[in-house]
């Protein structure tokens, strides 16, 4: 639409130049045309806490630790839950005397099982010092539930996808393909167990049994973590587990979550539990800001991220396939993750 038709259709309120825009704001604020007004950037505004009404003069704080995205090894970033950033965030919140309670905001379909276990351990240590309350977003499944299950209280939305208590492992093998192509690879070792698993060699029954044993061991540990956190027997958890996916509403009925409510509700509960009347909230972890990527996400045409360029070049469907391949490539070791994507229509 042109700017004139956009106004006619009610998509915008007024067509104006930048100086007219500033003049309108001054008029709205009751300022003279020669006055100036304070403004903040969209980037700074996005980083301010908008989750609850905070008293920034208060000495007490409620920490909100965000665990968003696939769980993987390494540091992590705004789109992935990394061991390094999560453990450091929990340690900082735990050691800060001004922080009275911690709300762990989980929005993750899971991922690396070892990383999930290490984050679980950090939460267990934190609980000994101050309360940990979980607020589930769209997803808190598999590894996402793993890191949530031992919280003092778990809140979920009615539509949260949770549960998926199960694990799996991936062993890609190209031996048949390479044989057809006439490509042969050989390993030289002192004994049959000395060499690493090779994607170019047929999977032996012994190695398959070894891998299966590892998956079962991690699954048993997963069940025990949930049983301890939710005060159930392992058999009770197993009857709800085996990869089953539950909505937040159903998860409450079967005891996997405690209450239905959003982040506001979880923060309010944390404050009430610690008898904290006035408080500010503080977000963890802190990540470096990618200015260009942020503006690209806002849809500004002159700031385009590398991902947006790739999507434009290969098309939406091919881009989705590339993303799936990236996920598979990033999965190393045993996984506590949703083995599929859920789309809402």
Which positions does each model-derived feature cover?
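Short glycine/threonine-rich loop-to-helix capping motif typified by GTGT followed
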Residues: 113-118, 250-253, 293-298
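Extracytoplasmic
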Residues: 9, 37, 58-62, 99-101, ...
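Flexible, low-complexity junctional segments that flank or bridge functional domains
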Residues: 1-61, 73-75, 88
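Intrinsic disorder and flexible/low-complexity segments
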Residues: 57-62, 66-92, 96-97, 286-345
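C-terminal intrinsically disordered, low-complexity extensions immediately downstream
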Residues: 268-297
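Cleft-lining beta-strand/loop regions that shape enzyme active-site pockets
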Residues: 54-177, 216
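Active-site proximal loops enriched in glycine and acidic residues that flank catalytic Cys/His/Asp
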Residues: 66-69, 106-108, 136-138, 151, ...
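Charged, glycine-interspersed solvent-exposed loop segments at helix/strand-loop junctions
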Residues: 1-24, 175, 179-270, 274, ...
């Amino acid at each position: 639409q042109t700017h004139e038709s956009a106004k006619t259709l009610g998509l915008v309120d007024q067509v104006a130049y930048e100086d007219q825009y500033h003049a309108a704001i001054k008029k709205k604020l009751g300022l003279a045309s020669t006055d100036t007004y304070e403004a903040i950037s969209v980037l700074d505004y996005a980083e301010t806490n908008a989750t609850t009404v905070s008293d920034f003069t208060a000495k007490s704080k409620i920490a909100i630790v965000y665990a968003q995205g696939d769980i993987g090894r390494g540091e992590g970033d705004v789109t992935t839950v990394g061991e390094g950033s999560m453990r450091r965030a929990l340690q900082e919140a735990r050691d800060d005397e001004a922080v009275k309670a911690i709300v762990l905001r989980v929005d993750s379909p899971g991922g690396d099982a070892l990383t999930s276990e290490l984050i679980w351990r950090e939460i267990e240590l934190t609980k000994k010092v101050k309360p940990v309350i979980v607020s589930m977003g769209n997803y808190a499944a598999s590894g996402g539930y793993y890191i949530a299950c031992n919280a003092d209280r778990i809140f979920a939305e009615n539509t949260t996808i949770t549960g998926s208590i199960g694990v799996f492992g991936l062993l890609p093998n190209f031996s048949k393909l390479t044989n057809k192509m006439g490509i042969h690879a050989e390993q030289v070792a002192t004994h049959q167990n000395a060499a690493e698993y090779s994607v170019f060699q047929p999977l032996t029954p012994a190695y398959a049994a070894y891998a299966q044993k590892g998956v079962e061991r991690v699954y048993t540990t997963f069940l025990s973590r949930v049983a301890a956190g939710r005060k159930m027997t392992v058999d009770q958890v197993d009857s709800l587990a085996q990869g089953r996916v539950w909505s937040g509403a159903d998860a409450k009925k079967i005891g996997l979550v405690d209450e239905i409510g959003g982040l506001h509700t979880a923060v309010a509960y944390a404050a009430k539990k610690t008898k904290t009347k006035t408080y500010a909230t503080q977000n963890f972890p802190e990540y470096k800001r990618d200015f260009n990527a942020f503006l690209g996400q806002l849809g500004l045409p002159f700031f385009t991220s590398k991902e947006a360029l790739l999507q434009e070049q290969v098309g939406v469907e091919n881009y989705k396939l590339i993303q799936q391949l990236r996920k598979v490539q990033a999965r190393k070791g045993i996984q506590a993750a949703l083995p599929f994507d859920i789309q809402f229509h």
